[in-house]
């Protein structure tokens, strides 16, 4: 199973992934786009072509882990719709969550200090296209996810 969490940088993808993983039993792993870039694809920059390579690498990594029977939760910007479409064909079980957040609020919070840059930043000079064919859209108001919310999300995932 691969759960693919999409949203702006700073939208809460990693937080949601960590909350879900605490409730998932068995072999599980969190693949975070920031960690992959830091440790595995550090040679890639932030151009669209390098972002595409990074996204493809992450998708392939998730496929490998799925083939080893891991429950994979991936938090990623995922700005390429063709990768979202390919994921539905690539993975045995795939569930896509769009963590929809108000960009003005994210930019104001600027937790990762990336929105003060003006080059090659998604949401600033690179468009963030709304993800397609989402299995679940969560409107993040930046309040903690309750146990009931996490349970409801996992129930929706289990229903596929």
Name the predicted role of every residue range.
Residues 2:
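Walker A (P-loop) ATP-phosphate-binding motif of ABC ATPase nucleotide-binding domains
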Residues 73-75, 87-109, 138:
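Conserved phosphate-donor/acceptor-positioning beta-strand/loop module used by diverse small-molecule
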Residues 100, 108-160:
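Small-molecule kinase domains that catalyze NTP-dependent phosphoryl transfer to phosphate-bearing small molecules
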């Amino acid at each position: 199973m691969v759960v693919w969490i999409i949203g702006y940088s700073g939208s809460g993808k990693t937080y949601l992934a960590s909350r879900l993983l605490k409730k998932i039993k068995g072999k599980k792993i969190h693949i975070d786009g920031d960690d992959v870039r830091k440790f595995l694809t550090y040679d890639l920059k932030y151009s669209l072509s390098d972002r595409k390579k990074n996204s493809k690498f992450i998708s392939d990594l998730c496929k490998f882990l799925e083939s080893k029977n891991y429950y994979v939760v991936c938090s990623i910007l995922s700005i390429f719709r063709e990768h979202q479409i390919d994921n539905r064909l690539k993975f045995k079980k795939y569930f896509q969550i769009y963590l929809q957040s108000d960009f003005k609020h994210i930019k104001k919070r600027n937790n990762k200090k990336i929105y003060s840059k003006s080059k090659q930043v998604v949401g600033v000079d690179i468009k963030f296209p709304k993800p397609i064919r989402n299995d679940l859209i969560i409107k993040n108001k930046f309040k903690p996810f309750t146990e009931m919310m996490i349970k409801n999300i996992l129930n929706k995932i289990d229903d596929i």
